[in-house]
Amino acid sequence: MLPTHELSRVATVKQPQDSEINSSFLSVLLLLFICHILTLNAQTNLETFNWFNELGASLPSWLLLCVTDLGDGITAGALILICLTYKPQWLYRVIVTTLLCALCVHFLKQYFDAPRPAAVLEVINIIGKARYEHAFPSGHTTTAFALAGVIWLLADKLWCKLSVLMLAVAVGLSRIAVGAHWPEDIAFGAILGWLLAYLACGAVPLSTLKLKYQYWIIFALSMIVLVSELKHLGKDPFSVLLFNRYLIITALISLTVYMCSKFQLSDKPHK
């Protein structure tokens, strides 16, 4: 069994090849730019919205709510913290990505103050709470692609990279299906999140703290996520979202408590 500092050192050294990462990452970025250019045409933007929104009307509401909730800050935060329990050396990069994402989305939404589909269209399929302003860019999509970008840059397995990317795409499309955003909002949000992940991972080093300290930080962040969700208790009328979030948060806290106790015990001297 390797000591704690050795485990941290090995985890830090083992990274994928930069050239392979950059080429695949930039390929995804190119596809996102093409999608964004297409949505700049007003007619294409409207027709694409109508198609996906009508498709959403034929799908179960609970399914769309669960998928779209994966891009919510609380739910996404809980999910990425679960990932951090397995890859704690990603800690600094995830924190910086999250902060950049929150700041950029807030600023752009306030600056553009673009109307949402519900404020423009008379006939629309809305699932969840109707919103009318601050459409551009999609915060859920930006969050989903930012966290997917971090995992894409840092994970070793191709199936893991593709899985998180497909989840991020599903979150973006679900925002159209529930009537919350235009395709243009989704495409730009995806580009923004993807670029922020690249910026954070390129500028911020991997964590070199002892594993037990990393896990205690993750535990503290888990408590922040829990308190944030409790503050919203009773405000969201959709029970499926509450069940979805509490299930994820319960798994997160259980896992972080286990990992904290595990590495706390491993640091105790043997008698």
Q: Locations of the language-model features?
A:
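Juxtamembrane/transmembrane-helix boundary motifs in multi-pass membrane proteins
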Residues: 19, 57-60, 84-89, 93, ...
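Alpha-helical transmembrane spans of integral membrane proteins, capturing the lipid-embedded, hydrophobic core
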Residues: 29, 94, 98-106, 186, ...
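Membrane-interface loops
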Residues: 46-47, 84-171
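N-terminal transmembrane-helix/juxtamembrane module of multi-pass inner/ER membrane proteins
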Residues: 1-75, 107-133, 263-271
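Loop-to-helix transition at the N-terminal end of transmembrane alpha-helices
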Residues: 54-69, 95-98, 185, 242-248
